[in-house]
Each structure stands twice: as C-alpha cells, then as structure tokens.
From Swiss-Prot:
GO terms for biological process: nylon catabolic process. It comes from Agromyces sp. (strain KY5R). The active site is at T267. Expressed as an inactive precursor that is cleaved autocatalytically at Asn266/Thr267 to generate an active enzyme composed of an alpha subunit and a beta subunit. The gene is nylC. This is 6-aminohexanoate-oligomer endohydrolase. The lineage of its organism: Bacteria, Bacillati, Actinomycetota, Actinomycetes, Micrococcales. Its EC number is 3.5.1.117.
Amino acid sequence: MNTTPVHALTDIDGGIAVDPAPRLAGPPVFGGPGNDAFDLAPVRSTGREMLRFDFPGVSIGAAHYEEGPTGATVIHIPAGARTAVDARGGAVGLSGGYDFNHAICLAGGASYGLEAGAGVSGALLERLEYRTGFAEAQLVSSAVIYDFSARSTAVYPDKALGRAALEFAVPGEFPQGRAGAGMSASAGKVDWDRTEITGQGAAFRRLGDVRILAVVVPNPVGVIMDRAGTVVRGNYDAQTGVRRHPVFDYQEAFAEQVPPVTEAGNTTISAIVTNVRMSPVELNQFAKQVHSSMHRGIQPFHTDMDGDTLFAVTTDEIDLPTTPGSSRGRLSVNATALGAIASEVMWDAVLEAGK
C-alpha cells in the first residue's frame, strides 16, 4: 500500500523542493543603529525569483532597506476589496483590520513597522489629489513581524518605505524569498543557535474562472514542514546537520525538569486573495479555515509567543455555481471547498518562503 502523501493539487503542481542547505540566522543582538543613523534609501526587492500570476486588479510591490535588512510588502487592490481578518497568538501586531481595504501592508520592524502602512495610506491620499469624501477614503490594513532577532540593527520600515513598496507595485509579479517584509524573517526558535532565515512566499492557482493568490511571511517560533512531514526549515543543529521537530526539544526539557528555552518575538503574517464572492459569514469562515490549515506547514503555530494574522480578501468578481455541476453535486463547489483548495495554495506559499 502506497503511504506517500499526495499533494491535493498534484495535477496542477508537482510539488515544491526546499533547498536543504542551512541558513542559520546567528545569535540576536537586540539593538544597534536605527533609522536616523543611516541615509536610508528604499530598494526595490527582487528576491530569489519572481512568481508570475494572473489576477487582474491585484498589484504587489516590495521594498527594503539594505541597512536593516528589513522591508515591506504591499498588496494593492485599487478598486478595493472586502476583507476578513483572523488574528491569533499572544503578540499580534495589527493596524486597521478593516472589513474593506484598498491595500494590505505586511512589514518587518515589529510594532514600529506599522508606520509603513501609514506611508501607504498617505501615498493613496496623494493619488486622490487629497480628496477626502467619505466614499473615497482609501483603507489600508497592516500586519507586522518581529524581525529584530535575525539582524543587528534597530532599523524599521517607516512611511518612506511603505510608500516605496506601493510605488513599486505591479500586476502579476511577486518576489519570492528574502524580499520585502521577509528580508529578516526566521523560523525554528527553540534555540537561537538553530534558528534559520526564511523569507516571503507566494503561490497562485487558477481553476476555471476561480483565482486564488496566497502570500505569507513565516516568522514563527515553530519550524516549516513539507507534506511528507519533514522539517525543511528551522531548528537546524549545525553539529549533527539535522533539523528536528521542536516537540523533541520540549519533551527533553520536561523530562529533565528544565524550562523550555523557546524564544519570544515571532509572528507569521499572510493574505489569501480570491475573486470568488462570499457572504460575510463565509468570508470569515474562509479566513479561519485557511489560517487553521497552516498548522500543517508550521509547527507549532498560533502559540502565545507568536502573533499570527491572516487577511482573507475577495474582489467579488464571480459567483460559485448554485446548482450541482457534477456527480459530486453541491459539495464539490462551495466556500468550504474553496477554503480547502486555498489551504493547499497557502501551504505552497509557506514552502516557497522557506525555499
């Protein structure tokens, strides 16, 4: 009997291989020169490679400060889109949280990095030529990761960087890896000596008229897992060359009556964007379903030392069929089925970030 895990979208994607080479972050400094110590100039992030996607009305831009390194990633939807927010964990860094947004800003810099979202808001107001009618308000929600532990500066994404990320936004492209908000993201913080750098990741699927785009910046205390149950990023022991699941460290700590040394300062921020129209209840459940599914690719997840936020966004362009279209009937095409597929797309994005 074949027990090899099968990708739920195996007919679309043959699978994602993660480079096994270690990317150790090194011990944290927790301080250093800040923004005023440098002549900062935003740099367009190009990352490891560019994901090409076909989603009209959605543009993405990423910018960073090399001096950090830290950055911001902006998902711009000029027409605006309904949004549901699912935030969990003990240290959520979130601003806005609106149920309708024109842009989502993901950034490093912990709470200080929320300033990048203000830069996006200001730039959108300028594009409106400072018209302030209520119906014209440009809404921006932001979420941040704590990325100071993987670098030796106190540089954070400010208004200028958020503005630059918006200016760099283009349709159909997303920079994978160390780019934008993922410049100094890391995973597997059971022990700082075993922490590894991740990045930002995205994946896209089109099924008929249905479009799904997943974007994620994994910066968890946990490790990144592939579909075979293998730890592919985080908690890497340089002496043995082995990555292991944190549960083994926790078991040893309890057996030895020594408190686990899990480090604070962790967050995974993400967005799942679709063109499928859903009711407010369905959209909220869609957000929860996809966010919960990420436990498969990040373990542990949603801990009291994390602050995880997912934005579920719909451009409301198409309706799912309301009558059975196959022998599987209604169960094959509904918001729950959409969430199941989107969950696999998000797992692909997590693996791309760790790649």
